Amino acid sequence: MSSRPLLTLALSLHDRLDELSNRGQIHLVGYDLDVAAVAAVARHECLPIVNDGEVIARLSESTEILQRSYKGSTTIYGVHTGFGGSADTRPDDSSGLSKGLMQLLQTGVLVVENLDIPGLDTPQDVIPESMPSSWTRATTVVRINQCIRGHSAIRHQTVKSLLKLVAAQITPIVPLRGSISASGDLMPLSYIAGTLEGSPDIYVTKGGGKSAKIISAHDALGEIGMEPLRLGPREGLGLVNGTATSAATASLAVLDAIQLTLLSTGLTCLVSEGMAARVEWLHPFIAETRPHPGQREVAEIMRAFLKGSRLVSGLEGEASTHQHTLNVRPDEGLPQDRYPLRTSPQWLGPQFEDILLAHSQISVELNSTSDNPLTNLKTGAIHHGGNFQATSITSAVEKIRTSLQMVGKLLFSQCTEMINHQMNAGLPPNLAADDPSASFCCKGLDINIAAYQSELSYLSNSISNHVQSAEMHNQAVNSLAFLSTRYTIKAIELLGMMVAGVLYAACQAMDLRVMHATFLETVTATLQKAIADLLPNGFEAEDVERSLASAIRGLRNAWWNNAGSDASERCSLAAVAFVQVLCDPSKHHTDTPKVKVCLDLTAKEMRELQDDVRSHLSQAYHKHHSAFLEKPTTEEYIGEGSKALYLWARQDLGIPMNRGLVDHPSPGSIGKRTIGSYVSMIYQGIQDGRLFQRFATVGREVGLGNGGTNGIRKRAYAEYEIS
């Protein structure tokens, strides 16, 4: 097993999705469907194909078993009986049972009016009560895969009709609400079955993109020359009595959740660099002494991403050594990072493990028979059971949703600490690049992310404990899997917004950290040279150097510690600290060797020297500030993985460092955008997969891409496969 199981899985799924999207086809055989294939059909117009001889033979044998049993003395549910709590009825003519089933199930709320609006890729633009088209496409491919296992007595002709709908871009408009996922997702699947029947009162989208239109199922079938399907014995039940909608949407959810959870490790690296963290908490020894696989994987990813950083210290783990290669933070303060950074491997690790388990549960469900009753191809028997109960999916998506909340809580805590100048080790309030008394850059993001996290936390509550008895008390327990999956997808949207906001803020924080650190590096070198001539003669060069170093240290600490001040005041306070240390040995730091050299100045001379130093600092800062905003040098100082994510935002998306009030859009300004517009650009890049593409690429570049496919194509429960 890979030492990085979630990352290995994510890279495998990412590669497979690319492969299938480029190929344009997915061959279904009933036992090796994976979440990447579901996403390829749902989101990338990949076409499912069923042409395997064994599959077709299974379908034929299954229907033959049903036909023989139909004529026998055994009572078969849904063939000789009514449905659910009405199964005690025995219709004289069972040929109309499928029609009766469709009538009882096609009861969802869809306000269908004003449909003559071309160019809509999703019916939700017109019918907000409907499922997204991608969910319906995913549902269709999953139901096909479940049915072709040969246990549902579905004819090959019926499977071909479903495949033809997908190929012709005919997507049923399915109500968003109304499924309790007990006897499967009856109601959503009935609208797909109704489309096959050519119902004039079920609507579909036909075509995609600008050519999409909404028409009736009857008209859509007519346009492609497809005859309405007359459902055979038990076929109506076989189409609807399964977990396909829950499993399909859970597949999309887990794919996105895996990517967002991994991205949180990259974001934590960016925040660590923005905060100039002391990252000995990533040392392998810590994970070895508490060997949870998720914790170990998180730490390993973050170490690789931070490699080469000049903004963090302690990457090699020496607890007593906090020296950075660049002066990037004050010497005082906490000797170790606060919990949102220091315990991030311990916080994120369990989420990695839960999401891996959720993926496993969903993968099994994709390749399971979900129906009742089931035909046994080996014995010819028909078995009544409850494989339609989607509780495995509920279990999976509730783990995912809880994990998303935990990831969101960590990112929220990191971000609000990074924006707060009283906690961020020397960065300006709200990450303002200009004077913080009038400019508030990321303050609104702090509020936004709190709002997102509040909603995310609300959504993380369990759905399964809200089960209501339904359908004549026959479905007294029901999984609510689709409902739980819907809220999980909403949680994914919210976490995506949080990731976008935190990425924007972290890039700003890294820019500011580098801008101020490089300013101090430059100005203190020139200041040391200018002040050296003022020191009295007769002292050893080593003593003079020590005195100047102590004064420079005082200046740097004053600069970082007064990040909440405007530039003019910050320069004054730093100048005072510098001169005080030169003139008063008691102001030297206690952990430095005793200083023997100091200036003997009158109060007036001290003020004059302070003014000179302040003026020097002010001129140097404004020059450096302007040059840095014109051409930031941040990428030269950050880790290899962080650099890739930073440059994705700065170069690929063209999102610049926020310079302050001068960047606010106003009438007549050209090319300026609100902070929200830039965050929205990042969010769009998260939704369409571009950010994870960059993450995956750099993950391989920094040595994290080794490993196999993690079993994503392995057959689930192979001992039950039908050969």
Swiss-Prot record:
Catalytic activity as recorded in UniProt: L-phenylalanine = (E)-cinnamate + NH4(+)
Enzyme class: lyase
Entry keyword set: Cytoplasm, Lyase, Phenylalanine catabolism, Phenylpropanoid metabolism
UniProt xrefs under Pfam families: Lyase_aromatic
GO molecular function terms listed in the Swiss-Prot or TrEMBL record: phenylalanine ammonia-lyase activity
Modification after translation: Contains an active site 4-methylidene-imidazol-5-one (MIO), which is formed autocatalytically by cyclization and dehydration of residues Ala-Ser-Gly.
Cross-link (5-imidazolinone (Ala-Gly)): A182-G184
Pathway linked to the protein: Secondary metabolite biosynthesis; Phenylpropanoid metabolism; trans-cinnamate biosynthesis; trans-cinnamate from L-phenylalanine: step 1/1
Domain of life: Eukaryota
SUPFAM superfamilies: L-aspartase-like
GO terms of biological process kind: cinnamic acid biosynthetic process; L-phenylalanine catabolic process
Catalytic residue positions: Y77 (proton donor/acceptor)
Positions contributing to (E)-cinnamate binding: N241, Q336, R342, N372, K443, E471, N474
Modified residues (2,3-didehydroalanine (Ser)): S183
The EC number(s) this enzyme carries: 4.3.1.24
Main localization of the protein described in the UniProt heading: cytoplasm
Gene3D superfamilies listed in its UniProt record: Fumarase/aspartase (Central domain), Fumarase/aspartase (N-terminal domain), Phenylalanine ammonia-lyase 1, domain 3
Cellular localisation: Cytoplasm
CDD domains reported for this sequence: PAL-HAL
Family per record: Belongs to the PAL/histidase family.
Function: Phenylalanine ammonia-lyase; part of the gene cluster that mediates the biosynthesis of squalestatin S1 (SQS1, also known as zaragozic acid A), a heavily oxidized fungal polyketide that offers potent cholesterol lowering activity by targeting squalene synthase (SS). SQS1 is composed of a 2,8-dioxobicyclic[3.2.1]octane-3,4,5-tricarboxyclic acid core that is connected to two lipophilic polyketide arms.
PANTHER family: HISTIDINE AMMONIA-LYASE
Record's protein name: Phenylalanine ammonia-lyase
